[in-house]
Amino acid sequence: LARRISCSPSLISQIERGLSAPSVGILYAIATELRASLDFLFGATAVGDAMLATAHGDGHLRPENGAAHTARSGWPDGHGLVQRAGRRATIDLASGVRWERLTPGADERVDFLEVIYEPSGHSTDARRPLRHDGQEYGLIISGRLQASVGFETFELEPGDSIAFDSSVPHQYWNTTGADVHAVWVVVHAHPGRA
């Protein structure tokens, strides 16, 4: 795997053991190579209509108490239809970016995320453009985010949105001293793969 995605075996091992956080680029490369969805990499298992795992503030997912419940038989917080803010599955990336899944269950067709860029946060740790299948849509909620798509660079401000074919090389970065909060949707051309 490491050779196929151009990273070191030790990095893969550290990611597997929770000792290192991947960049967005490495995360997408792993998902693509494994032909897995990002939901799979979030680490939760789909049961019925809902994911029975939640983030616990340390960047790791653990099964919910009473994991035998499904969305239709007593799943808390909206019966599998509502994702409560404090119970989102999260991934903290090495490059100062945090992804919080906004859906209460797995959907291999789409990634619906709140993305938080810390000051100096960047979509890839190597600061190289990323590309993957699908269409990408973003809306800036707060802060200012630099976006590069193809050969164009944009500064996105609160209320601005962006949409493009995500097979075009792209990257994002925060050059300000404040967090950037954005809502991001990636619709996959080949469901089940990132």
What are these regions (language model features)?
Residues 1-13:
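Short alpha-helical DNA-recognition segment
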Residues 25-40, 46:
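DNA major-groove recognition helix of helix-turn-helix/homeodomain DNA-binding modules
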Residues 43-95:
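Short, charged recognition helix plus adjacent turn
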Residues 80, 85-127, 184-186:
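A short glycine-rich, His/Asp/Glu-containing loop-to-beta-strand
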Residues 97-98, 108, 157-158, 166-192:
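Ligand-binding loop in jelly-roll beta-barrel domains
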Residues 102, 150-167:
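Short acidic-glycine-tyrosine-enriched beta hairpin
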Residues 123, 145-146, 162, 167-171:
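Histidine-centered metal-chelating micro-motifs
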Residues 125-158:
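A short beta-strand-loop-beta hairpin characteristic of the jelly-roll/cupin
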